[in-house]
Amino acid sequence: MEFIPTQTFYNRRYQPRPWTPRPTIQVIRPRPRPQRQAGQLAQLISAVNKLTMRAVPQQKPRRNRKNKKQKQKQQAPQNNTNQKKQPPKKKPAQKKKKPGRRERMCMKIENDCIFEVKHEGKVTGYACLVGDKVMKPAHVKGTIDNADLAKLAFKRSSKYDLECAQIPVHMKSDASKFTHEKPEGYYNWHHGAVQYSGGRFTIPTGAGKPGDSGRPIFDNKGRVVAIVLGGANEGARTALSVVTWNKDIVTKITPEGAEEWSLAIPVMCLLANTTFPCSQPPCIPCCYEKEPEETLRMLEDNVMRPGYYQLLQASLTCSPHRQRRSTKDNFNVYKATRPYLAHCPDCGEGHSCHSPVALERIRNEATDGTLKIQVSLQIGIGTDDSHDWTKLRYMDNHIPADAGRAGLFVRTSAPCTITGTMGHFILARCPKGETLTVGFTDSRKISHSCTHPFHHDPPVIGREKFHSRPQHGKELPCSTYVQSNAATAEEIEVHMPPDTPDRTLLSQQSGNVKITVNGRTVRYKCNCGGSNEGLITTDKVINNCKVDQCHAAVTNHKKWQYNSPLVPRNAELGDRKGKIHIPFPLANVTCMVPKARNPTVTYGKNQVIMLLYPDHPTLLSYRSMGEEPNYQEEWVTHKKEVVLTVPTEGLEVTWGNNEPYKYWPQLSANGTAHGHPHEIILYYYELYPTMTVVVVSVASFILLSMVGMAVGMCMCARRRCITPYELTPGATVPFLLSLICCIRTAKAATYQEAAVYLWNEQQPLFWLQALIPLAALIVLCNCLRLLPCCCKTLAFLAVMSIGAHTVSAYEHVTVIPNTVGVPYKTLVNRPGYSPMVLEMELLSVTLEPTLSLDYITCEYKTVIPSPYVKCCGTAECKDKNLPDYSCKVFTGVYPFMWGGAYCFCDAENTQLSEAHVEKSESCKTEFASAYRAHTASASAKLRVLYQGNNITVTAYANGDHAVTVKDAKFIVGPMSSAWTPFDNKIVVYKGDVYNMDYPPFGAGRPGQFGDIQSRTPESKDVYANTQLVLQRPAAGTVHVPYSQAPSGFKYWLKERGASLQHTAPFGCQIATNPVRAMNCAVGNMPISIDIPDAAFTRVVDAPSLTDMSCEVPACTHSSDFGGVAIIKYAVSKKGKCAVHSMTNAVTIREAEIEVEGNSQLQISFSTALASAEFRVQVCSTQVHCAAECHPPKDHIVNYPASHTTLGVQDISATAMSWVQKITGGVGLVVAVAALILIVVLCVSFSRH
């Protein structure tokens, strides 16, 4: 692009420095001639000086003199010491002190419209005055460093990450203008040039940094084109995340991996009412190894602060120096935790126990079938808190012990494959089963295991139930637990373990009790006549007491333990807790799935016969692409042959994970519409059996009725003639009457007797008498055929020749069917100009509804903290604002001196159980969104053949939005049908959309869709209704039993059925991001076209065709351009002519041809008519074409028809000819019989 001189901003001229990285040709204005001559004179003087002053050394450029002086000044310190100083080394980095042209230009503008945003005295970003608004990135914390702007009320938009407010009136003159014009090229910002290409802004890597958020990007006229929010490092260049404008509509461009460029604000933590940066604890250094208990207390005090994990990392790293990170650092947090013993319902021998490998949680959200199991032991860590892949540590009688990881096993109905381990977590792929067992073998070769009831049925990915990943196939989206040990967003709660009872610490010594601590901290209590309790770290003797009267427990507050519902919490510390990250996060990935063998397909009349060969259970589904989809599906497990009927609108069949197959029927038939009557009847019977039977039956009935009527009239006339002679004795019948009525002239013998006589005596006369009436009838029929037609031809179907719209001006309106992939031609006839043909084809049509998100729902997680056991007293519940929170106190649970409850008193012991619901960790990837769908907006991608060029444009089909094709303006829509496949309520799950009447927000029902609701996957507002009821724990067991409805989300996933992608009518293709329906073949699409005068060719300039004739040598109807027509012509001059069919039942492939001399042209056409008669217009001349089309041989094709599909087939000319002959012959017989009857009646009446 061309740069405008910078005098626009400075009101003065100066020579800009060339921009070397971009080889853009700049338009340099010529200077006045005197300046050019002065420059040449200066060059000449310089050259003479160089030649004459040889003794003087050549001078270096001025900018290097300073460097030379600096080097001379630095020689002294460099000679005094051998160590190189750092300031000279940093000089090259600070070399660019003078800003370049672009930087100076931006600084001049920024002085007025840019303001710093400060937080605690530090600049975190910038605010910009643009138009009538002051704009600041929403992620930039702090206030604007301006008294007037700081007190404004900003409106926040999280979608665009922007805050806006109205500019005070007295500051509007300082604001910059903005523009949506962004031609590709280079723009300017504070750090130099910004390249805009492919819809993205990029800069050289290193030119921007955190703290630049909010800086504007200017064009060369000083207008703001975008505001910087952040950047994504892409190697040599950095892609900018910006907010920009597109035709007054704000848009946000965010490249993948973009980070916000606000200056980081140090997160503060608290210690003894003193705040400090979380990454720098005040104890120098605050090391867990040195002060473990105090460090954990500090972490518990700051567990809810944003910088908790920074404090945790700093507290566990003793060295103040920066260390190289490794995979071992991810295990570093486990040195502050320990394994534990917990209750297990089945320890492998049919009874419960306190197991070192107790199962806490089994997660199966991954769609690839991987299980994530949480246990009480820790894997990958030794008892010395070091990282070791080959070991695991478990609690052996309250003391951590090591075991080999090789002895770890997981099984359901068969052994599982362990794919990953770290800390408390195991990843495994397991076969189907109803129970899950985890166990290990310790160093003493003793096996420990724990079994839980768990129904495991690996989900199906795709549409085939396969057992192992194929080598080749198809990639489908799925989710899995990533085998990464790095810190994730998922976390678990830990807390201080309770005191652990240990009777081995007590021993009886001659009436006294000795407590041996063995280097540990022990809490004791003895009831020996009085209360005797305390906390000791050395051995102690209790006088006059017995072991049964004392209780001793080991106290260890130097390590955390998982907050398990199977272990009581520490009574002294209450709700104090910590958090640690856990490995193996759930993530969306792609999985390789097999593709079923292609079926063997045989085509029949309006049907497809598919022979299927499934290697494993494979899903077959199909739907009609008409208004009623009639979706059907079935799982095929063995070789099977299926016969599917193909409707007129088409059939879509999906077999396994293959792409859908689409079929359309053709009007194929065994007979022909141009043969004998029986062939014609067979032809129409195969096409329209019901109507053909009805028509043939009615016609047969009418013909038979007419024949019967003629026979009846003849019999009536004969009787009228015979009666007078029969009543007269000896009467003789006239010869003519006896000949017509087939009676004897005399009454001596009957007709039968005469016939027998002639047969016996004169057989030639018998045959002559029999042939005379037949010969007379044939002669009369042939004579009447030469007469004018007695009856008009009965047209069974009238095909209207509508043609194209004719306009008197350059504005043209047409309506095309909303069918993708079928070209449509329209003819523009303008008086005085040669006709113009426009060809249009819909490449895609999109219906995008306006959505408003009600909530998202996902699988819930039941959080059960460790139960609180109140020894010798009663606990009380407190109200907590948590989703579906429940709290109960149970009395009479634990007996006197029961060790599991850690109580030692003879009074009542109580347990406080509490539970609540929160979103599962999988909700970030596995969730369904409930939307309300409103009016859908339609857009069409249109291919237009205009003036010999194919041009593709995209327009909103609203009847208002105009797009330009060269010099013509097209306005598309509005569509004739406001139909949309989406209901008022829809649910979106990954790439699928479902019409569903979901419950509103805050009204979810247990066990159904929406039992847990949240506004967004990240929001903290959660509503839950899971029917959570706490139950009374069994005596002698530490646990929190409860009853709860199953997850409504998981139930919905199993029962949701087919999505709209498979069940939508009219062949709609449903897509998401955004939600839209594409290529729905419903309704029509009106198009208004404004064509300028220059696009037309005057009649005098266009070729004129004469002597045109049309011949159709071959035609196959209902086939894709199966007809060929040859048009002969004579033309006055060479040129191009538009070709168009004036009948909408015939579609011509060619739109424009070149004519020259006396020649002929060949065109291809498509029609659904058996007898096609149409007119073809070439330039301004029309010619009549007639074709006798035969049915296609192919029953089924994989493309839609390119012509207008008729609801009922036409009657061929041959069929109409046979109808005329048959009806004419029968009508003649009736007419002759009627004439005879009339004559006989007249004669009869005249006698009387």
Swiss-Prot record:
Cytoplasmic topological segments: 714-748, 785-795, 1246-1248
Region entry Host transcription inhibition, spans: 36-68
Stretches with biased composition (Polar residues): 1-10
Name this protein carries in UniProt: Structural polyprotein
Residue numbers spanned by region Interaction with the capsid protein: 716-720
Alphabetized UniProt keyword annotations: Capsid protein, Cleavage on pair of basic residues, Disulfide bond, Fusion of virus membrane with host endosomal membrane, Fusion of virus membrane with host membrane, Glycoprotein, Host cell membrane, Host cytoplasm, Host endoplasmic reticulum, Host Golgi apparatus, Host membrane, Host nucleus, Host-virus interaction, Hydrolase, Ion channel, Ion transport, Lipoprotein, Membrane, Palmitate, Protease, RNA-binding, Serine protease, T=4 icosahedral capsid protein, Transmembrane, Transmembrane helix, Transport, Viral attachment to host cell, Viral attachment to host entry receptor, Viral ion channel, Viral penetration into host cytoplasm, Virion, Virus entry into host cell
Biased composition (Basic residues): 60-72, 86-101
Disordered: region residues: 1-104
Short sequence motif Nuclear export signal: positions: 144-154
InterPro entries xrefs: Alpha_E1_glycop, Alpha_E2_glycop, Alpha_E3_glycop, Alphavir_E2_A, Alphavir_E2_B, Alphavir_E2_C, Flavivir/Alphavir_Ig-like_sf, Glycoprot_cen/dimer_sf
Region annotation Binding to the viral RNA: where it falls in the sequence: 84-114
Comment field (misc): Belongs to the Old World alphaviruses that usually cause fever, maculopapular rash, arthralgia and myalgia.
Region (Interaction with spike glycoprotein E2): 155-160
Extracellular side: 262-692, 749-763, 817-1224
Chain residue ranges for the region called E1 fusion peptide loop: 893-910
Annotated spans, Dimerization of the capsid protein: 183-193, 219-223
Annotated source species: Chikungunya virus (strain S27-African prototype)
Disulfide bonds: 113-128, 269-278, 283-287, 286-318, 344-450, 347-353, 416-430, 478-591, 526-550, 528-545, 721-742, 858-923, 871-903, 872-905, 877-887, 1068-1080, 1110-1185, 1115-1189, 1137-1179
Region of interest (Transient transmembrane before p62-6K protein processing), ranges: 721-741
Glycan attachment positions: 273, 588, 670, 950, 1079
Active site: 139 (charge relay system), 161 (charge relay system), 213 (charge relay system)
A cellular component term, taken from the record's GO annotations: virion membrane
Transmembrane segments: 693-713, 764-784, 796-816, 1225-1245
Motif (Nuclear localization signal): 61-99
GO molecular function: RNA binding; serine-type endopeptidase activity; structural molecule activity
